[in-house]
Amino acid sequence: MPTSYGYTTLLKTTLVCCLLTALVSIFLPALLPLTATGSAAVIIFTLYFFRDPERRIPLDQQVIVAPADGKILLIQPLDHAFTGNDSTLVSIFMSPFNVHVNRIPLDGTIVHLRYVPGKFLMAFDNRSMESNEKMEIGIDNGSLRVLFIQVAGFLARRIVCPLHRNESVLSGKRFGMIKFGSRVDMILPAAVKIMVQSGQKTCAGETIIGRY
């Protein structure tokens, strides 16, 4: 089933494709087979892009799961005001072919929520973390604080994040998406042992990024 976050886009895409096909059938009937095939392909890809499969969420309460499908782009040490010194940055690159529904990485309470306007550099460009439009989300579970960031990209210029400050959230819960690719950056405190490596594929809600 497609995610509800994509219903508007799906409706608009379907209407445009149907209208285009209808107009071609009237004014340029010779191009109808090509137009109909192209329109069907666009609709099928849009449905594929907004797919939202179920996931097996780990029951272990001491793990942090991936917030996004994709591939580990970068792991590096980082000091951050929200998570403290000796934190670790883990960046997940999402291609247009990945599932784009994002999921909460651990149980806790939303204590930080900040939208930051910015540029739309390519997601695999590490400057995008600082320069691009993004949504910062911070969770506190009483034992540690984790920050994760939805980063817009060159193609992905629409961040969806319906969360609210002081909202209680559960690990693996769907919470939004980044439309048409980009990246999600995680900043994990020193207490977290990183369980992934660069180049590894991730599955939102299932892949264990770290333990604490």
From Swiss-Prot:
It is a peripheral membrane protein. The modification Pyruvic acid (Ser) is found at S182. Binds 1 pyruvoyl group covalently per subunit. It is an enzyme of class 4 (lyase). Its cofactor is pyruvate. Keywords: Cell membrane, Decarboxylase, Lipid biosynthesis, Lipid metabolism, Lyase, Membrane, Phospholipid biosynthesis, Phospholipid metabolism, Pyruvate, Zymogen. Its EC number is 4.1.1.65. GO terms for biological process: phosphatidylethanolamine biosynthetic process. Catalyzes the formation of phosphatidylethanolamine (PtdEtn) from phosphatidylserine (PtdSer). Belongs to the phosphatidylserine decarboxylase family. PSD-A subfamily. This is Phosphatidylserine decarboxylase proenzyme. It comes from Chlorobium phaeobacteroides (strain DSM 266 / SMG 266 / 2430).
